[in-house]
Regions:
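Generic N-terminal targeting/processing segments that precede catalytic cores or assembly contacts
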Residues: 2-189, 193-195
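A structural signal for small-residue-enriched, beta-sheet-centric alpha/beta enzyme cores
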Residues: 6-31, 38, 195-202, 206-359, ...
Length: 394
């Protein structure tokens, strides 16, 4: 997922721009986020702490009560408590209870366990333990069949091994098996099944810290859904602000759910993700559907790519030029309407409303065409709040 800047928790030592290697300082979870909620730490940080503790146990015969995990920003470390766990022959085992802070996270309080042993490969080999998922389809930047342990947590775990051994990871040879107690049932309450991750949770995190109810985390999820939607180089996908697009795509296009991305208010960001993913895949998408209510999508005509009502003007203003050009008798209806849904209700059944909505769909498609790259055709379908088709689908 996309990285989010950690809270600064500034100090002269940590932030001195002249310092070549600033001394890492502790990250204080007791400092609340800007929204007044408590931060936590990720499954990736949990697995890293358990890895560090397991190696310490292997080398010293003693399991530490806590370990310090270096965070990816290079400026902070987090002290993480270690939980006792039964030992198994041939392995060193350690567990961490994940603390998600005040974020509504399904993995909050999950027990993340690492089993560690030496191997003769000279490499760190990541293994899937019980309750951690396996990747079954492309688009996640992990090979099919790999454990669902993302790139940043893997690097954090390698670094933790290096810190304990005081040596470069090229000299390491360890099997690191990551598991999660009840992970398979926890994962059913997440989007993992939709993303093609089966059998358990994912080990995630780009900063190591959970920002409660974070906008960046939500946008990072959109980026993942786009990559999964495009992962098998399909002929078409759907972007929609909400459930209308999903209902249309499932009912009329017979598309699998993984090819339907709910972009919420973040139309511009979602289109940028499509462009970037297509470039990564060296793939041209034959058809992109943009489907939803005109209260959101009409704003794209004016180049408004964040459609949240608090951050953008209403859609009625964007529709006025379309009405003036294609259905002049509707202009007064628009001006007298306080919302697009009100306009839809007042003009239903008029002969000139269908060409108006068709022209609106075409205008939205032109706007999207100017934003997205690597797409051969764009089709827009608009619906009222009750699911009634307004334009070409009517």
């Amino acid at each position: 997922m996309s990285a989010k800047e950690l809270p600064s928790q500034d100090s002269p030592a940590a932030c001195d721009p002249l310092a070549d290697t600033p001394t890492p300082r502790p990250f204080d979870l007791s400092t609340l986020a800007s929204n007044g909620l408590r931060r936590g730490f990720t499954t990736g940080t949990s697995a890293t702490a358990a890895t560090k503790a397991a190696l310490t146990l292997l080398l010293t015969g003693s399991l530490p009560e806590s370990v310090d995990v270096s965070l990816p920003d290079g400026l902070h470390y987090l002290r993480v408590p270690i939980t006792e766990t039964p030992q198994e022959p041939g392995w060193a085992c350690a567990s961490v209870i994940k603390d998600g802070g005040d974020d509504p996270d399904q993995t909050h309080r999950a027990r993340i366990t690492v089993r560690l042993r030496r191997n003769d490969s000279g490499k760190v080999v990541f293994l899937r333990g019980e309750g951690v998922g396996v990747v079954t389809q492309p688009g996640l930047r992990l090979a099919i069949g790999e454990p669902a342990i993302n790139a940043v947590p893997r690097q954090m775990m390698r670094q933790a091994l290096e810190e304990v051994l005081e040596t470069d990871s090229q000299d390491l040879g360890f099997d690191v098996e990551v598991g999660c107690e009840n992970g398979e049932s926890i994962a059913l309450r997440t989007f993992n099944p939709r993303l093609g991750i089966h059998g358990g949770i994912s080990i995630l995190g780009t900063t190591g810290i959970v920002e409660p109810k974070s906008l960046a985390s939500f946008m990072a999820s959109i980026a993942v859904y786009v990559r999964v939607a495009l992962g098998e180089r399909p002929s078409e996908i759907v972007l929609s602000p909400g459930n209308l697009g999903q209902r249309f795509a499932r009912g009329h296009l017979a598309l699998p759910i993984k090819q339907i991305v709910q972009m919420s208010n973040f139309a511009g960001f979602s289109l940028d993700c499509v462009s970037e993913t297509l470039e990564e895949l060296h793939h041209a998408l034959p058809l992109l559907w943009i489907v939803g209510h005109p209260g959101k999508l009409a704003k794209l005509i004016d180049g408004v790519w964040d459609t949240h009502s608090h951050r953008s003007a209403g859609a009625v203003e964007a529709l006025l030029p379309v009405a003036e050009a294609h259905a002049p008798l509707l202009v007064d209806f628009l001006r007298d309407s306080n919302s697009t849904e009100s306009f839809i209700e007042r003009t239903g059944g008029r002969a000139d409303v269908l060409p108006f909505w068709s022209a609106t769909e075409a205008a939205i498609a032109r706007a999207v065409e100017g934003r997205v790259r690597g797409v051969q055709e764009i089709r827009v379908r608009l619906f009222g709040m009750d699911g009634t088709a307004l334009g070409a689908a009517a």
